[in-house]
A protein has these predicted regions:
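Radical SAM/AdoMet-radical enzyme domain recognition
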Residues: 3-88
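Extended interaction regions within the primary functional domain
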Residues: 9, 56, 141, 146-154, ...
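Short, surface-exposed linear patches
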Residues: 14-15, 37-41, 77-78, 107-110, ...
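Glycine/Thr-rich phosphate-binding loops of Rossmann-like dinucleotide-binding domains
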Residues: 25, 95, 174
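Short clusters of hydrophobic/aromatic residues that line enzyme substrate/ligand-binding pockets
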Residues: 27-31, 104, 110, 170, ...
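Residue-level detector of alpha-helical recognition elements and their boundaries
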Residues: 42, 55, 71, 86, ...
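A C-terminal junction/extension of Radical SAM enzymes
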Residues: 67, 84, 90-162, 167-169
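Radical SAM enzyme core and accessory elements
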Residues: 158-187
């Protein structure tokens, strides 16, 4: 009861919860923890039951990008209580380096799926954003959802970015990532 009261009294508290797929096997495979999907869903509903603000964080990778449209529909039907939905580009550090061939995908290669998912959620009046994907890698229909999101201490811009008309709005690139998209170009 004490922790419940603490959460209820904290109007500035936002829970950022990763959800990797609408399909439990995919979610568990990505987290490498059997049962993590079920635990995540229980946690989401528990937080919702006490009125907590929830941000769903969907880190896009090679293992989940094809189901982004289905995931958006799942969120709309089953998780309408979430305050924010954030689609996030993958930072190529930590476990993603070890599993690079399994998880890394050039953002240019999942634009169709991302566009469908984001547009669906926006049309259904859910608050949706895109983080950590340079604007030049997005379809123009997605520009308005892109956030300048990479922390100052780990953002970088390559030479091509200096000529870009959208640089002041763009999240840039992770200086910590070992690989960048070859499709980065000025707009």
């Amino acid at each position: 009861v004490g922790s419940e009261m603490c959460i209820r009294d904290s109007s500035n508290l936002l829970f950022g919860i990763p959800l990797h797929s609408d399909f439990s096997i995919d979610h568990d495979t990505i987290t490498q923890v059997k049962g993590s999907y079920t635990e995540t869903m229980k946690g989401l509903y528990n937080l919702a039951s006490i009125g907590a603000d929830i941000e769903l964080r969907i880190v896009i990778n090679k293992m989940n990008y094809q189901r982004l449209p289905q995931l958006s529909e799942f969120i709309w039907k089953n998780l309408p209580f979430v305050a924010y939905i954030s689609f996030m580009g993958l930072e190529d550090t930590g476990y993603s380096i070890k599993n690079h061939n399994k998880v890394w995908i050039d953002p240019i290669d999942y634009q169709k799926e991302l566009e469908k998912a984001v547009v669906n959620l926006a049309e259904w009046k859910l608050d949706v954003s895109i983080f950590n994907i340079p604007i030049c890698l997005l379809k123009p229909s997605l520009y308005k959802f892109a956030k300048k999101s990479i922390s100052d201490w780990k953002v970088c811009y390559i030479d091509a970015c200096s000529k870009c008309s959208k640089k002041h709005e763009c999240c840039g690139l992770f200086s910590t990532s070992k690989i960048q998209s070859p499709s980065i170009k000025p707009i």
